[in-house]
Regions:
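Cofactor-binding loop segments of dinucleotide-utilizing enzymes, especially the Rossmann-like FAD-
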Residues: 11, 31, 113
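Anionic-ligand binding patches
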Residues: 4, 42-221
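Flexible, glycine-rich phosphate/dinucleotide-binding loops
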Residues: 15, 35-37, 117
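A short beta-strand-loop structural module common to alpha/beta enzyme folds
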Residues: 26-36
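N-terminal beta1-alpha1 ligand-phosphate binding loop
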Residues: 2-24
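Short loop/helix-cap segments at secondary-structure boundaries that form the rim of catalytic
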Residues: 17-21, 38, 60-61
Length: 221
């Protein structure tokens, strides 16, 4: 049997970078999905729906190949904080998040080419921001780093280092819960296991407290 290829339905540079950590036969494709939130749609339902829609948006995929899609949202006071529309929006978002806890939710959807409906996982991580100054916010915005990110920040940004504490999956906060992804892929008989837990922790220099539980199938993260 030919080696399966993987199709990542994402424009995210961070997700593409993370998949570069492994020797997979990768294809990248954009998913043209309307990301608007439905009226009265709960944040968790929203992020689940978008991951599914993105995964199903790629068609004509070979039967043994895999489509992977994800969506990430930042939730503060039950409200979704999306990608900033401009610098002023980014500033206000970071002010609202400052010195407060919030939730980052990433949903990942996987389907094989011969499958209509994707398998779905969601990872929810509680994140606490530090008490950064207004001047630090403005300097960070000048770097343009926050402009394409949910919640207007990147947990891995070493200069701004916005996060003071979080519990769980760092990769999920970056946009792809890799252990949840691996757990889902292992359901398929033609998938060759990848040691994502070891690779992820090595790349991020982070000892994940939930990786063993996730791979074991526990409902954590």
């Amino acid at each position: 049997m030919n080696r399966s290829e993987f199709w990542l339905a994402s424009n995210s540079p961070r997700r593409r970078e993370m998949f570069g950590w492994v020797d997979w036969k990768l294809n990248f494709a954009s998913s043209n999905v309307d990301e608007s939130q439905y009226e009265n749609e709960l944040p968790e339902n929203h992020v689940r729906r978008l991951a599914i829609d993105k995964c199903k948006s790629l068609t004509s995929i070979p039967a043994n190949d895999f489509v992977i899609a994800a969506d990430t949202i930042v939730v503060l006071d039950h409200m979704i904080l999306g990608k900033p529309a401009n610098a002023e929006h980014a500033y206000q978002t970071l002010v609202n998040l400052r010195d407060r806890p919030h939730w980052v939710m990433t949903s990942v959807a996987v389907r094989r080419g011969d499958q209509e409906n994707p398998e779905l996982e969601i990872c929810k991580t509680k994140v606490k921001m530090r008490n950064y100054s207004d001047a630090e916010i403005l300097q960070y915005i000048e770097s343009v780093d926050p402009m394409d990110k949910a919640g207007a920040y990147a947990i891995q940004n070493k200069e701004f280092h916005p996060v003071v504490d979080f519990g769980g999956c760092m990769a999920s906060v970056m946009g792809m819960p890799l252990c949840h992804l691996e757990r889902t892929l292992r359901k398929y008989s033609n998938y060759q296991e990848t040691d994502w837990p070891k690779i992820c922790q090595f790349q991020l220099k982070y000892k994940c407290p939930i990786t063993d539980q996730v791979i074991a199938g526990d409902n954590v993260g």
